[in-house]
């Protein structure tokens, strides 16, 4: 298979979007260098690595240029978000398959090769996700179900126990590949034909659920989404965003959740979802106030709940959340 310039396609294009995560990014690239590029023999796959820097201010760009000259580095002037950043990289890519890889990941031996082989051997599969591990090698949840009112009303743990095939999780591990709704975007393999037929990641999400929405569209097009548990990747977990701005992150998650329902469910479900979320937050605020007085460590959590409830009550202003912070920095 040739690209538009008549050059044979590489087996895999690795796309990493990063934002102010210099140290973990350098570790991720070192793992690619150690596990993939240094490999020899018949099992070696041809790869390219594209790093899309979302306007970092921590020296990430300079460090990558200095230490990893083999990386195709795209230096963006601002934070475009996860989906748009990945799409910039995907548009640059030339691989038969693409891997969307978080900056806070570490590759383990054979993870890439086994997922590429699985895609090659199963043309009906459009997306593959490996098993994500914590740094201590314990398992992370890396499978998503499509958001629904059922999963909002019934606790996730109950659904996993009653319907393990429909709601798979690390609690009930699978040894063989299993078809799922969606896999986590921290490490997501997608075949080139999907990009051409379905399109790139939906850009109406700034952060959260963009890969879930994408998998929804990919499955609608007739492709399968599969979790391959024998392929394993370490995920340090939220190094670039979740630990830095917890309240903004939670606001952004709510915004993405409501957007998913507007796009893929009906208006009634969308309204019911928001009602459920508001009632839950109000309950957390009332009960959490007493707990916060008793345990000062919970005071920050209670303040975050108040702010998120306020965001709902004043009409969900666009200036709040991660995307709002990007707009505010751009206008300043």
List each language-model region with its residue ranges.
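A short, conserved alpha-helix in the catalytic core of glycosyltransferases
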Residues: 173-175, 179-232
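Conserved donor NDP-sugar-binding/catalytic core segment of glycosyltransferases
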Residues: 106-142
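Short, well-formed alpha-helical segments that are part of the catalytic scaffolds
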Residues: 21-40
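A conserved acidic beta->alpha catalytic loop
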Residues: 31, 53-61, 78, 108
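Short aromatic/hydrophobic "clamp" motif used to bind/position activated sugar donors
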Residues: 98
């Amino acid at each position: 298979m040739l690209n538009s310039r008549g050059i044979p396609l590489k087996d895999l294009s690795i796309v990493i979007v990063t934002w102010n995560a210099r140290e973990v990014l350098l570790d991720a690239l070192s793992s690619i260098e150690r596990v993939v590029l240094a490999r020899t023999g018949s099992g070696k796959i041809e790869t390219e690595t594209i790093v899309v820097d979302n306007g970092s201010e921590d020296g990430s760009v300079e460090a990558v240029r200095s230490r990893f000259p083999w990386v195709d580095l795209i230096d963006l002037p601002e934070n475009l978000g996860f989906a748009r950043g990945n799409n910039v990289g995907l548009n640059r890519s030339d691989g038969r398959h693409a891997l969307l890889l978080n900056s806070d990941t570490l590759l383990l031996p054979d993870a890439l090769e086994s997922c590429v082989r699985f895609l090659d051997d199963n043309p009906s599969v459009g997306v593959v996700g490996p098993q994500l591990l914590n740094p201590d090698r314990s398992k992370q949840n890396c499978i998503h179900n499509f958001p629904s009112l059922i999963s909002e009303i019934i606790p996730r743990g109950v659904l996993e126990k009653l319907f393990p095939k429909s709601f798979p999780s690390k609690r009930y591990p699978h040894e063989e590949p299993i078809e799922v709704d969606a896999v986590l975007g921290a490490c997501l393999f997608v075949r080139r034909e999907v990009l051409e037929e379905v399109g790139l990641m939906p850009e109406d999400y700034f952060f959260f659920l963009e890969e879930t929405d994408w998998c929804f569209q990919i499955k609608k097009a007739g492709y399968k989404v599969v979790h391959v548990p024998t392929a394993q990747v370490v995920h340090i977990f939220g190094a670039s965003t979740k630990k830095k701005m917890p309240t903004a992150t939670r606001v952004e998650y709510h915004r993405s959740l409501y957007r998913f329902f507007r796009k893929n469910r009906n208006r009634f479900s969308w309204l019911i979802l928001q009602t459920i979320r508001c009632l839950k937050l109000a309950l957390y605020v009332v009960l959490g106030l007493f707990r916060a007085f008793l345990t000062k460590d919970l005071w920050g959590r209670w303040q975050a709940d108040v702010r998120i409830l306020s965001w709902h009550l004043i009409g969900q202003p666009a200036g709040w959340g991660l995307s709002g912070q990007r707009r505010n920095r751009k206008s300043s």
